[in-house]
Each structure stands twice: as C-alpha cells, then as structure tokens.
Amino acid sequence: MKLIVTVVGKDRVGIIAAVTNILADNNVNILSINQNILDGFFNMILFAEASESKIRLVDLQQKLREQGEAIGVEIKTQHQDIFDVMHKI
C-alpha cells in the first residue's frame, strides 16, 4: 500500500524526525520527501510504501495525527489512490 503524508505548520526543529521515526518504527519505507519553508511555515509531502508494515492505516493515521498535535503541526495520511483521485484535474 502506498501512502501520502502531508505536514503543514510553523517551522521548528525536529519535524521531519518526528514523522519519519513513527514511519520507521512501523516498518513503513519512505520513497520520496519534498519539503520547504515559506514565511516561517513548514510544508512537506512524503511518499511511502507500507506493504511490509503490520499497522492498520487508521492506526498509523492516529499515531501521526497525535504526533502532529504534540509538535504543533497538522499531519494528514492518505492512501495514494485516494490522494490521486482528490487531486486529479
């Protein structure tokens, strides 16, 4: 299962580490990361492969959402198929 993780919020040290540690702990492989900072706001989109992971998508979404709340950013996780349909022109 391929996933898209988006992160948005005020920039601070450790955002990427906070997100990627959860993914690594749950055997989710990162395929690509794009991030930037604009006017002090952090934006990241991460593409990942979760076929080797045992965690259910809903549980991973909750862990990442809770981590986002703890560090002051919004983290959304979607199956890539859903993301693709929502962003198709």
In which residue ranges do the predicted regions lie?
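A conserved regulatory-domain signal marking ACT and ACT-like small-molecule sensing domains
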Residues: 1-89
